[in-house]
């Protein structure tokens, strides 16, 4: 077995030799085999001439065993081994040669031998062997060079181990006494940033500064890129200002990196300032930099400034591309200037399909479906451009927006017939459209058609169906869709659970809704404020305030903030339970928590105070409401009028009625019916009739409740045949 292995060694050397001429070239070095020519001196060996040397090398490269190889040479030098290892030998062969030569008496491996062998090992990912060789080098007293470690770092990068470079750089200094320079730091930083180890890169940079190693322009560029990648743009900008302290001047690449990140984070003004600085520093931005700024301006509807930036592009010799025009057109469409976008479109020499799609989508978004179809027709007939899935999706969306889901479905079938495969979004629009129209069966058919087309429905599509089923109280079917989602490779999200929980609460299945909340948490889906508000409302409707409070506590514990809806539900529940003082305390807490109360919040509390007989407090609260900047509406006055009349203060109720008229708030049916009811109950039927006449003159239209109030007061209850009256009157 040993002889066979050795034969394979020599055979590998022979097979991988590129040519006999190269062999002869290395054979010419065999003069160093003699004692006088070798690096190591030592032993007497017969002098070998050119022809004999060639023969010796031929013997070496033949499939001899290792014993024959030993007999062919008196001694091999590190330089000869270095040249041998440079040949394309495999790792095992190279290691065996390395071990064999190292066993020669008086032989000592050189740095070059180690470097070429470590290079081969690194290319093959043999990093444990590399670590052993580095220790061996240290034990042999070989002086390390930085280039060796940089080479290993590159190999770690290629193997996908960027983090190992920091370990190696620490060992350079602490283990192998090789002090890293800016070269090593730059390589490590570059590898870390390309490997998305941005935080580690920042730490390495600060370590570099603490060791007084001067950073280069390349160093700053890489570290700024790392900061921008994790949205620490302020740190990157701080580095920009520190560059001059280290004798570095920012170049175009650094400015472009920062401008891109600022624009991406919607810090457009700073991006503009940096662009101006870039011009002053003599750096030339590229087209992408201009496009970044133009996009940022368009995001904030600063279209005129974006157009001026295009002019600056032209002055600088950059021709706006489809991306530039696309950003501008999209910005114009966003602010409703679709016709201006159309005018810009006709200035583009050869518009690509993305430009057409931008304009079509702009028309569709603003309800101009016919204009969108005209652009599509022009695109096909005049420019010969075939519509893509984005084009068709815009049309489908346009028909969906108009409620013409049937026509949208026809567009989908048409695109498929023309060889354009619909995507998930195409089908999801239709599913949502049919669900909104209450055509759930059609929506389900579209979902099945989508699956037949080889596409997996997404969470949005399933959510549309579940929500639609729940709204129609078809809970079992909604649950079935919910169970189908994992089988289709689709994970339910918070909206899925919220729809089901809301549906269960609507049919008073709160127990099952709570189970679903527990399942939701165990599945790793975080319940939000909407989830808890739905359940809290359900308990409060049933008068179970204690259970509602438990959920509020859980809500706070889980980190979901109480919003105005939560507070309103609780205040309303407390008022219904007659705990008005607690409701008012909760209202004050809402104010302390920074929630500005809306009219809804105020009206709930006013209504609660009035129903509890605390009319004066309600009137005072209405005045406080005005002082806080809220404007009382008709609901506010209706609650106060009802409260005053309930307290026997009908005159005050009528005064409040005149007040709301004076403030320009038109009374509604509830206002008239409330006053007429209390007037009739107090025996003031004639006044109620006068109030009705006054209301009719002002445009009030009585309803069944209005006539019922009057009839019950005029005609005795036992003699009133309501059915016959309504049949005769209506």
UniProtKB/Swiss-Prot annotation:
Q: Which Gene3D superfamilies match?
A: Tetratricopeptide repeat domain (1.25.40.10)
Q: Name one Pfam family in it.
A: PPR_2
UniProt signal peptide: none
The record's keywords, sorted A to Z, are: Mitochondrion, Repeat, Transit peptide
Query: Spans of the PPR repeats?
Result: 110-144, 145-175, 181-215, 216-250, 251-285, 286-320, 321-351, 352-387, 388-422, 423-457, 458-492, 493-527, 528-562, 563-597, 598-632, 633-667, 668-702
Task: Kindly list the places in or outside the cell where this protein is found, as annotated in its UniProt entry.
Answer: Mitochondrion
Q: Gene Ontology terms, cellular component aspect? A: mitochondrion
Keyword Repeat annotated: yes
Q: Look up the transit peptide and give its residue range.
A: 1-18
SUPFAM superfamilies per record: HCP-like
The record's comment on protein family reads: Belongs to the PPR family. P subfamily.
Please state what the protein is called.
Answer: Pentatricopeptide repeat-containing protein At5g64320, mitochondrial
